[in-house]
Amino acid sequence: MKTLPVTLLFIVSILSFVPSAFAQKDLPADDASTAAFVELCKNPDDIEGRSFCFGFGEGVYQQYLASRAINAKPAICFANKTETRNEVLQKFLAWTKSNPQLNKDQAAKSLMRFFTQNYPCK
């Protein structure tokens, strides 16, 4: 029974030395634009930023699935099941460079455009 408090103390002490374990990134509160999203996502060494980007993109896609009418023809199909999240992100970053006119649009709107243009259902 004495090992439980010692174990908890050990875990708490480890976590106190790893503040980045709880670090978060988010889009700036006053800017949910495509440009702000790209800025957050483009650094491959920023683990928290990349994690946010993957989660945000997944959330946009899941919202699309949840809000699509059951009998509606799907507009987005990820046919290549071997493509990684990072590969999709790299395509998105390249796509935004080719479409700078969308930088002021909301990031979610640009992601939906990207998904429908690059992953259309056939």
What do the predicted segments below correspond to?
Residues 17-25:
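Sec/Tat signal peptide C-region and signal peptidase I cleavage site
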Residues 26-34, 84, 102-106:
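Short, structural beta-strand-to-alpha-helix junction motif
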Residues 7-17:
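Bacterial N-terminal signal peptides
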Residues 31-94:
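Short N-proximal segments of mature Sec-exported proteins
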